[in-house]
Regions:
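Gram-negative bacterial Sec-dependent N-terminal signal peptides
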Residues: 1-27
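Mature extracytoplasmic or organellar-lumen-exposed domains after removal of signal/transit peptides
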Residues: 28-471
């Protein structure tokens, strides 16, 4: 993959900050490494606005995703769907919610904004799931199935994990890299010398960039924190790190860490990668560049530099998702090994872990396919090796779906078709080949749960150096 020639310059500009966030807040200081505030640059604006940073709709969607994920374990389609399509009136924030030592400011989605997830979901066909459904149809199908059984042991599906990991890709990742950082960065789309919309105080480019940052999910002050501090915020553990303005509560609009930014921090705290820092730095420097245009159209040189920041964001964001695929392929492999020897007393517990890991693997692998880049043959290999469902103990797995579909594309009735395609050893080998694929195609570096050392021995036992993928 092509790397931006700005990367070296950007990484060289990163400085390690040793002072505490709480101290900054109490002193009323503002750091140049915080995303905002940014001044009004729009020519002719005469309103009261003084800060043009605005991405509350994106944060509300993160909250709706987290709440849908929480609702998915309860088995109510209507509750899940309300967080997916939006609802009139107040909607309680199910997650993230306050806990002892970590009070959160907002309790209602509408305190942040009133958007929906469905309208921003990738609209293309999903070849990683049976019957050529679109992404919204897949999500609706999973919510329908989750109402029947949130964890369906009969087919090995954990719908909470499938829904969460795929929605993060099909909404947040897709919207950011294939819309706001792509189409809306074009010279004739959302120009910088005009408001994003009538009455707005921010320009077209300013707001488009801010919305992409909102989908990324980092706190505005994430660059002031270590990866571990960012990680702990997402785990609701470190109020001092989260509470940048020192008011004693965590404002979800700017002080929390969501979605792929959280996963980036989880990899970076191992010390091998700097995904969160690199992406945040590129977002911040890109916003400063847009602001420096002072309400004028971006010059060719400015736009070229801006697209260099876009390249850094796209490359590293894709890697974060690929790292997640790598990690959960390793987790799934370890569960497959454990299931071969586990006693009856622990079988249900181990199988529950297996369902969770495979669901995360499947969701992230599908998310990898809805970005700006068509990953082509890599997607085909990935889909065949991951499958439509995890291999069960009788070596069967989902091979299709049969049922009745309404005119709206939603299934009225549906049941899974099961079949035997390959052996348990083949399934294990597939997980290792997925890890190798993530290294070869995306250059993943953190490599959590790396099990590749076992690949040669397993292939030898099967009697082939090739996987038994269903091709």
């Amino acid at each position: 993959m092509k790397k931006s020639n700005l990367k070296t310059k950007l990484l060289a500009s990163i400085t390690c900050l040793s002072f505490g966030v709480t101290g900054l807040a109490n002193a009323g200081a503002h750091s140049e490494d915080v995303y905002g505030p940014f001044p009004v640059t729009l020519k002719g604006y005469s309103g009261d606005c003084t800060n043009t940073v605005s991405y509350s709709g994106q944060i509300a969607r993160h909250v709706m995703h987290d709440s849908l994920k929480a609702a998915s374990t309860k088995g109510s389609y209507d509750d899940m769907n309300a967080y997916y399509v939006g609802a009139d009136g107040d909607m309680a924030i199910l997650a993230p919610s306050s806990k002892d030592g970590f009070p959160i400011k907002q309790t209602l989605v509408n305190e942040i904004s009133s958007p929906n997830l469905v309208g921003k979901t990738y609209k293309g066909t999903i070849t990683a799931w049976p019957n050529n459904m679109t992404a919204p149809e897949v999500i609706d199908f999973w919510m329908m199935k989750a109402e029947e059984n949130p964890k369906d042991v009969s087919v090995g599906l954990n719908y909470q994990q499938l829904l969460s990991k795929f929605i993060m890709g099909a909404v947040f990742y897709s919207q950011a890299v294939d819309n706001y950082l792509d189409e809306k960065m074009g010279p004739d789309s959302k120009p910088n010398d005009k408001p994003y919309k009538d009455g707005a105080c921010y320009t077209g480019k300013e707001h488009s960039w801010d919305e992409a940052f909102g989908y990324w999910g980092a706190a505005a002050h994430s660059l002031l924190l270590t990866p571990e501090q960012n990680y702990n915020i997402a785990k609701r553990k470190d109020l001092d790190a989260a509470d940048y303005n020192g008011d004693g509560v965590v404002d979800l609009k700017s002080e929390y860490v969501f979605s792929h930014a959280y996963y980036a921090s989880s990899f970076d705290k191992g010390g091998k990668t700097t995904y969160l820092n690199d992406i945040n730095r590129a977002f911040l420097d890109g916003r400063k560049l847009i602001t420096s245009a002072n309400g004028e159209k971006l010059s060719d040189a400015q736009r070229s530099e801006l697209m260099g920041y876009v390249d850094i964001i796209n490359e590293n964001w894709q890697k974060v998702i690929a790292e997640s695929v790598f990690k959960y392929a390793g987790s799934t492999y370890k569960s497959l090994v454990a299931l071969e020897t586990v006693g009856n007393a622990d079988l249900a517990k181990e199988f529950d872990k297996y369902m969770k890991y495979w669901g995360e693997l499947k969701g992230f692998s599908m998310a990898l396919q809805v970005g700006k880049e068509n990953i082509g043959e890599t997607a085909t290999k990935l889909n065949r090796m991951v499958g439509f469902g995890p291999m069960l103990l009788d070596e069967t797995q989902i091979v299709g779906i049969k049922g009745m579909m309404g005119s709206d594309g939603k299934y009225i009735t549906a049941e899974y078709e099961m079949g035997k395609i390959y052996s348990m050893n083949d399934a294990k080998l597939h997980m290792l080949k997925i890890q190798k694929l993530m290294i070869d195609q995306f250059g993943v570096e953190a490599r959590a749960n790396d099990m590749l050392a076992e690949m040669a021995d397993l292939a030898s036992k099967i009697g082939t150096s090739e996987s038994a993928e269903n091709d």
